[in-house]
Amino acid sequence: MQEKDDTRPLLVVPYMWIGDFVRGHTVVRVLKQRWPNRPIDMLATSLCAPLVDYMHGVRSGIVWDLPRSRLAVVRQWELAAQLRARNYGTAIVLPRTWKSAIAPALAGIPERVGFVGEARFGLINLWRWGEKALPRFIDKNAALALPEGTPVPPEWPVPQLNVPTGEAERWRQANGLGTGAAVALAPGSVGASKRWTYYPEAARLLAEYGLDVWVIGGPGEKALAAEIIAAGGPRVRDLTGTDLRNGILAMAAAEVAISNDSGLMHIAAALGTPTMGIFGPTSPYHWAPLNGLAATVQTKTTVPCQPCHRPVCTMNDHRCMRDIPASDVVAIAGRVLTEAGAPVAH
């Protein structure tokens, strides 16, 4: 049987951090190029599951809420029973962990592709080697979708999130957000070192330009949203919450998004919303969205320890983020808005 004629269902086991889950759509697109007739499902946490609804080429998401710190063997057996009933021919296991490979193995999926990782002999039966030779995270992931031995291409298909026409507008109306030009701010991130702290001042300046400002994030950003609203005034709205679909639709409806290096940055870019990514301790080469950014914002000063990729600044000055003034970010946002054709009052 030729690869193009294969119709067996295929399972992708992605990383479950939001940004990495979005990158997983590149893997789906590569698989669809290789096997256009194979249905593709993705495992997803409850948090990430809404993303699947906007990923072309994904048949369905299978919710998989396993605790991060335990193997949860009983839950693995329950998941394996679900997978077995779907008759998958292949599982592409992106994470390197034991835990990510257990259920596909218990389900008896014939082809289980992945890097050896945590010595997963037996759990993974189509091993791949050379992971350390691949420079970027996306190269390591998407290479698993290619036939073994295929050279890694210089460019990959970019992730795409497609919100149906009218859905974002209906969401905007339902939330009473009006029709004015809006900037979405995503001030959160995993790791304090990646958080730019001048969002309140940026919100104030954006509001003075006559722009609506939406604060997007999870429940952990509620206090920060209140601080941003206090600085920015009535044009600023708190849209943080527990439902990621809310964040997806907000990013789809906004004229521009300003984000730290976080999952919401990847969502905005994959939606096609002009996105500004603020980078301090992390490298845009390794972690910026494949889709490209309308602006990559970094400090203009030389910071010898940058990038450190540490979750907390060990120098205790956080200069890589502190030396990016709000006025610079807002000026860049004004240019991005103008290029996008959005009206900006000065």
List the predicted regions and their residue ranges.
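Catalytic machinery of carbohydrate-active enzymes
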Residues: 1-346
